Amino acid sequence: MGRMLTEARQRVQDALQWLWQQEGTPGQRARGLAAGIFCGCFPIFGFQTLLGIALASVVRGNHLLAAAGTWISNPFTYVPLYWFNFRVGSLVLGPGRPWPGFDAVRQEGFSDVGWSVLTRLLLGSTITGAVCAALGWWLSVRWLQRAGS
């Protein structure tokens, strides 16, 4: 059992090392990672990777690291990340309408209720994504330059 864990840990370390040694300058790799982190903060399931790669192309970042960066959101982090994003958006825009019950949605229409939630979620995602991407860029540039790549 201990041997299997050691081998698994070594494989993960090798995969991470391979990922970090992708082509490009430290700045290009950091921009790719930051683009992926930014897109990973948005609730656009299935399109985060594509948008992360597209954004990495715009900022001339590494595409593979952009795809990896989108995994900041995954099945384990969806609920806490999007709840946090919604709370950040609510902090900026105000609390808005309270979360509706089924009767309110049926009477007022889902689009009216959904717009209040969606605007707060998207604004919070933008703010959280920008902060996390900037932090990820800064940390990865420092780490890559220190590693001497």
Regions of interest found by a model, annotated:
Residues 122-145:
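Transmembrane alpha-helical segments in integral membrane proteins
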Residues 21-39:
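Small-residue-enriched transmembrane helix starts and helix-helix packing motifs
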Residues 42-85:
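Transmembrane helix boundary and interhelical junction motifs in multipass membrane proteins
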Residues 34, 38, 68-72, 123, ...:
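Hydrophobic residues within alpha-helical transmembrane segments
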Residues 1-26:
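Helix-loop-helix hairpins and the membrane-proximal interhelical loops
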Residues 89-97, 139, 143-148:
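Membrane-interfacial segments
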Residues 79-105:
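Juxtamembrane non-transmembrane "cap" segments at the membrane-aqueous interface
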Residues 97-119:
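Short, membrane-exposed interhelical loops at transmembrane-helix boundaries
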